[in-house]
Amino acid sequence: MKTRDDIRNIAIIAHVDHGKTTLVNEMLKQSDTLPEHFSIEDRAMDTNAIERERGITILSKNTAVKYDNHQINILDTPGHADFGGEVERVMKMVDGVLLVVDAFEGTMPQTRFVLKKALEQHLTPIVVINKVDRKGARPEEVVDEVLDLFIELGADEDQLDFPVVYTSAMNGTSSYDSDVSTQEHTMKPLFDTIIKTIPAPVDNSDEPLQFKVAILDYNDFVGRIGIGRVFRGKIKVGDNVTLMKLDGSKKNFRVTKLFGFFGLKRLEINEAEAGDLIAVSGMEDINVGETVADAEHPEAITPLRIDPPTLQMTFRTNDSPFAGREGKFVTARQLEDRLKREMQTDVSLKVEDTDDPGAWTVSGRGELHLSILIETLRREGYELSVSRPQVIYREIDGVMSEPFEEVQIDTPDEYTGAVIDSLSKRKGEMKNMEPGENGQTRLIFLAPSRGLIGYSTEFMTMTRGYGIMSHTFEKYAPVIKNWNPGRQKGTLVSMNAGKATTYAMMGIESRGQLLIDPGTEVYEGMIVGENSRENDITVNITKGKNLTNVRAAGSDEMAHIKTPTHFSLEESLEFLNEDEYCEVTPENIRLRKKTLNTNAREKEAKRRRAASRK
């Protein structure tokens, strides 16, 4: 079989923050790709602002490095299972993977998730043990953990015989030996291992064209762009080709531009052939999973199966009294268009209409997946309201089932009991408990996804920020009956509109924890605090102190107010109950009741109580 020895196509897969993006940066620096004296910023492949802030990779990036007359096409994939749709698409474009594992933390749930996807595609693995210079690093033990994981996931004999390279990407060093003293300031061992181990792509350029779209992009000048791999044949600018749609239909179009990848740039090219990773423009409604084929011999590549969404939320137009004040895009049409556009590029996302023309059911792979979408919309200038995340139930063999996840926790020993107790209350079942080094314990649980909604805040508080938790979808199993997780405490709800006063807050704070600062504008039905008891309380938070001729109202009370709690977006979503919304604008995140009017809310509560007594 003829191959193209000048090309290697690889993906980098790893758990969140194990250093894969830093590794790609170092490969760019040390290859023949960038001009001399050219400096690249840290985490260069993370172009999305949210990715930079959170230190996670959401969207797959592709780049290419030149080394010893070879072009190594590198795809950087997300390390979080919530973005698994991206991982699965990338696996179809490559012939091998670099599995990056932290020399201290070892294998983690998301490492398992992405590795499983790679092994299922029969890709050739290279294991990179990164951060070998980290305090407490245990590279040899971690290699054993990786081998155990390969065996557990059903790797074949060839995959089990994986080469290992030890690196410190932050320092730009690597070695074939686990001893940190053997590290040299070069990535040559890694480059050489890639060239030697990863199979070269098959060269069937003389056969009819097949190009598979794996990632979508958009450019104001050329419109929609399909990024993928040429699996067969050749493609040139000006060619008349056929787009094989997912619904079975065919559309002919002319290739207007082709782009190749070099370093961090996308450069125009005139021709590409089997094995190349390229971008194609010329067809406005091209979608992920579709095939660009030879016009005379059109043949589609089997579409990719993506794991289904497990979590859903209602997204709706903002109808609070403050609607339209802070956002640029506030109408139902604008929000719907943006959500539908997101669905075109994110194959893990599903957007469905509801009976309400101003609301949509948005389904995704997890809390992080959906919260990143909300944060993106917010930064783009959108206003919206969102409901509490809910799991997606499925009927399997006539039995109603819900999603369960594997939860892996590393916590200081003194918090182990509290963590076990808290997860047990959320119907988690402990599968394993391993005492680790440095006073740490590793816990493995199987827990229902709905029990994990809102758990991360509780977990971080419980472990004083020292605990590390990650979880990944495991399976659907029969629904746990007669159990309703969620916030157990009630809320403090504003009874009127105005500005919150220090004087009023002093009288209210004994009822619970305040969530806003003095001077914050509020409206009727807005949540201003968490009650210390189970019921909701309506409060007058705008009440002013009568002025005297001695001093102005509120001037001397500030020192007596406990510091209010300020929630992040994720914490706000976790806080919500069924009768509440989170109002999201470019400037603020507010919590509110679905029914704003106090009297209407009380009537609804009476009806619910009466119904429950029947």
Regions found by a protein language model. Give the residues of each.
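Structural and coupling elements of P-loop NTPases
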Residues: 1-614
